Amino acid sequence: MAKKKPVEKNGLVYKEFQKQVSNLKKAGLIPKTLDVRKVKPTKHYKGLVSKYKDVATGGAKLAAIPNPAVIETLEARGESIIKKGGKAYLKARQQINQRGQIVNPFTVRVTKRGEVVRRYRKTTPEGKPVYITQRELPIKFENMEQWLTELKAAGFQLQPGEQIYFTFNGNYSRRTYTSFDEAFNKFMTYDIIIDAVAGKLKVEDEADLVKSVGFQRISGPEAKAYNRNRIVLPEMQFSQAAKKKYKRRQKRGYGSKGV
């Protein structure tokens, strides 16, 4: 029996168009009361699908931001924010895996404090599922001591079968620790961090120094065997401007004391 051809209206495959509108509805960009089955490919809806193409096609996920006060902090961290109808949404960042493939979060949400929680589903070489949860903290760099205190207070409670490590990334180095206290103490041995706490860095340097900080946990029955050395928490990424500053310091005989 021959398959039915998809119904086309205004040059669009109608069913595919409805699916794209449905994705916008799930993301909160159009009213929840809308009956997608009755939507016609009008100029209005075609415009919305075109404007939010990556969301409509399922290539990007949105999360509602429940507290408008954290929008400025999220934008300063380089997050992509969509504002529509008096509401704000965070567009989830994509990851590139080792094969060069784009990986979208399994789920993404924003807490009232402004924490961004992303959950990814990956598999072991044997095909077993592993879940990776990333939680980025909305901590401004202006108060470094508070930043470090909140970072330490926001640690995860381990659940049965979970594996957790702490890694510091920055200044062209990466070190992984099994104890948060050990990682925290090593974190504080860097000259550039000590200068920040002591207020020796200029405001523009502070803004460039740290992009984000967060925790990452791996859970699932295969968590322990998944990858022992790639769980990173806290993760601190230095901007290009900060890296250049650090290189100049090294040439003058300064640098990090620890690593």
From Swiss-Prot:
Keywords: Covalent protein-DNA linkage, DNA replication, DNA-binding, Early protein, Host nucleus, Nucleotide-binding, Phosphoprotein, Viral DNA replication, Virion. GO terms for cellular component: host cell nucleus; virion component. It is found in: Virion; Host nucleus. The keyword DNA-binding applies. GO terms for biological process: DNA replication; viral DNA genome packaging; viral DNA genome replication. A motif (Nuclear localization signal) lies at residues 243-259. GO terms for molecular function: DNA binding; nucleotide binding. The modification O-(5'-phospho-DNA)-tyrosine is found at Y190. Acts as a primer for viral genomic replication. DNA terminal protein is covalently linked to the 5'-ends of both strands of the genome through a phosphodiester bond between the beta-hydroxyl group of a tyrosine residue and the 5'-phosphate of the terminal deoxyadenylate. This protein is essential for DNA replication and is involved in the priming of DNA elongation. Belongs to the tectivirus DNA terminal protein family. Heterodimer with viral polymerase. Binds to ssDNA. This is DNA terminal protein. The lineage of its organism: Viruses, Varidnaviria, Bamfordvirae, Preplasmiviricota, Tectiliviricetes. The gene is VIII.
